[in-house]
Amino acid sequence: MKEELFKGVPIEEAYLKHNYCLDSAKHYLLNTDTWGVYELRLFARVAISMEPALLWRCLTIAIKKSQRFAKIPGNEDILYNTFETVFSVFAVFDEANYAEKTFHLWRDHVYEKEHIEQAIFMPFFEGWTHLLKQNKAKAADLMQQTLDQLERLGMKNTFSMYQSLSTFVLNEDFPGILLSDPLLSEGTRYGWEEP
């Protein structure tokens, strides 16, 4: 999926307009036996085109089929990036239940593997789930926990990015998805770019 599909077009309009273009990719993902880098990247790129139930189904398939792949050093972060993308797609379409289920799967995976870098971001995304359930005060408190940790660690760029993201999310002004993809430029956010 090319960035131009979404550039300057509201994400929901782009979804309706271009959803059918990705049917063959969805079919491939549902029918492949093993998932590696290619499949996880493809899944993240086409996630926006999937209906919520299909997106959830593909996420559970991705987790199961990428277990061997994730044991190779350096590859586990691709699965974490996939969680982030899928979560943000559910959030964009106000699918609070699916977003919360995705968050719990993601968090369980992070804590089981004791992935400290990902653990720092868990309060932020837990806060986002609370916002989807209309609890803005709890959302702001949880997001602030992540911001405080980033600030204490001296991670200025990441702090700045997540501070901007929290502002957009809490103001319900976040019309994009989170997608870390080296082919589209690292940290691309469709429909949203840092000021």
Outline where the language-model segments fall.
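Amphipathic alpha-helical segments of tetratricopeptide repeats
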Residues: D23-L30, I63-A70, F103-E112, Q144-M155
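Solenoid-repeat scaffolds in large eukaryotic assemblies
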Residues: H18, L55-W56, A96-E100, K138-M143, ...
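Hydrophobic alpha-helical segments and helix pairs
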Residues: M1-T32
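Alpha-solenoid helical repeat architecture
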Residues: M1, T34-R41, P73-T82, E112-F121, ...
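"A position-specific structural signal for the A-helix of alpha-solenoid helical repeats
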Residues: M1-F6, R41-R45, T85, V89, ...
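C-terminal non-catalytic interaction modules
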Residues: A137-P195
